[in-house]
C-alpha cells in the first residue's frame, strides 16, 4: 500500500482580524430608533463560516404602522360591512346566479347543423362502398375539348379508358383493336 502524504493543515489563526466582534453563532443586533416606526432585526454571520453549518446573512424589516383614524364620511358603510356583504354574496352556500339567456339567432338566417368531426373508415379494397365496381370506367372530356379517350384491351380485365394527364406521355396508347389516335390523350402504363 503506497504511503499517502499528509497535507499540513492550515492554521485558522492566520486570518486577518474581523472588524466586528466575533462570538460563537450569530450576533443579533436590534436597531430601535425613536424617530422611525420600523423595527429592524439584522442577523449577520461572524467570523469565517465553515462549509458545514453556513447560514446566509438575513436582513428582516418588519414595518409597524400606527393606527389610522377613521376618515370616512358619515353615511358610507365601513370596510368591514362591505367585506361581509361581499363575502356573503360570494359564499359557496348561496345559489349561483342564473345564467343569462344566450343571444337568439335572427329568423332570417338559416340554422346551421352543429359541426361534427369527420369519421375515418378503415381502408377497403374497393374504392367506394356506394358505387358498384364496373369493368369500364368512362371519362368525360371537359367542355371545348374534342379529343376522344383511347380504349385498350388488357388480358386481365375488359376495355379500360385512359384519363389524360398533364404530364408528358410516358408511352403511346397501344391497342390491338383500335389504332392509337395521334391528338388523343396519353395512357399511363
From Swiss-Prot:
Tell me the GO BP annotations in alphabetical order: mRNA transport
Task: Return the Polar residues bias intervals.
Answer: 127-164
- Quick one: where's region Disordered? 1-28, 84-189
Residues the record lists as Phosphothreonine modifications: 174
Tell what triggers its expression: Down-regulated by P30II.
Q: Where is this region: Homomultimerization?
A: 56-70, 123-131
| Intervals of motif Nuclear localization signal, and RNA-binding (RxRE) | 2-18
Instruction: Tell me where in this chain the PTM Phosphoserine is found.
Output: 70, 177
**Which keywords are on file for this protein?**
Host cytoplasm, Host nucleus, Host-virus interaction, mRNA transport, Phosphoprotein, RNA-binding, Transport
User: Where on this chain is Nuclear export signal (motif)?
Assistant: 82-93
**What is known about its processing and modification?**
Phosphorylated.
Q: Cite the record's Pro residues compositional bias ranges.
A: 111-125, 178-189
What quaternary structure, including any partners, is listed in this protein's UniProt entry?
Answer: Homomultimer. Multimeric assembly is essential for activity and involves XPO1. Binds to human XPO1 and KPNB1. Interacts (via N-terminal nuclear localization signal) with human NPM1.
Instruction: Write out the function statement from the record.
Output: Rex escorts unspliced gag-pro-pol and singly spliced env mRNAs out of the nucleus of infected cells. These mRNAs carry a recognition sequence called Rex responsive element (RxRE or XRE) located at the 3' region of the long terminal repeat (LTR). This function is essential since most HTLV proteins are translated from unspliced or partially spliced pre-mRNAs that cannot exit the nucleus by the pathway used by fully processed cellular mRNAs. Rex itself is translated from a fully spliced mRNA that probably readily exits the nucleus.
Additional comment: HTLV-1 lineages are divided in four clades, A (Cosmopolitan), B (Central African group), C (Melanesian group) and D (New Central African group).
What does the UniProt entry state concerning the protein's domains? The RNA-binding motif binds to the RxRE, a complex secondary structure consisting of four stem loops and a long stretch of stem structure, present in incompletely spliced viral pre-mRNAs. This region also contains the NLS which mediates nuclear localization. These overlapping functions prevent Rex bound to RxRE from undesirable return to the nucleus. When Rex binds the RxRE, the NLS becomes masked while the NES remains accessible. The leucine-rich NES mediates binding to human XPO1.
As for family, the record states:
Belongs to the deltaretrovirus Rex protein family.
Could you identify this protein by its name? Protein Rex
Which organism is this protein's natural source? Answer: Human T-cell leukemia virus 1 (isolate Zaire EL subtype B)
Amino acid at each position: 500500500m503506497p504511503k499517502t502524504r499528509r497535507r499540513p493543515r492550515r492554521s485558522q489563526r492566520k486570518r486577518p482580524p474581523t472588524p466586528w466582534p466575533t462570538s460563537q453563532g450569530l450576533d443579533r443586533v436590534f436597531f430601535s430608533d425613536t424617530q422611525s416606526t420600523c423595527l429592524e432585526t439584522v442577523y449577520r454571520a461572524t467570523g469565517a463560516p465553515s462549509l458545514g453549518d453556513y447560514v446566509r446573512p438575513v436582513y428582516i424589516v418588519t414595518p409597524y404602522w400606527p393606527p389610522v383614524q377613521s376618515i370616512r364620511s358619515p353615511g358610507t358603510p365601513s370596510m368591514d360591512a362591505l367585506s361581509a356583504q361581499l363575502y356573503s354574496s360570494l359564499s359557496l352556500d348561496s345559489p349561483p346566479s342564473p345564467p343569462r339567456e344566450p343571444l337568439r339567432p335572427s329568423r332570417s338566417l338559416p340554422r346551421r347543423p352543429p359541426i361534427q368531426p369527420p369519421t375515418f373508415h378503415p381502408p377497403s379494397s374497393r374504392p367506394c362502398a356506394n358505387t358498384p365496381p364496373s369493368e369500364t370506367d368512362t371519362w368525360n372530356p371537359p367542355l371545348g375539348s374534342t379529343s376522344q379517350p383511347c380504349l385498350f384491351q388488357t388480358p386481365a380485365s375488359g376495355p379500360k379508358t385512359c384519363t389524360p394527364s398533364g404530364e408528358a406521355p410516358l408511352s403511346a396508347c397501344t391497342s390491338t383493336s383500335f389504332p392509337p389516335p395521334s391528338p388523343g390523350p396519353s395512357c399511363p402504363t
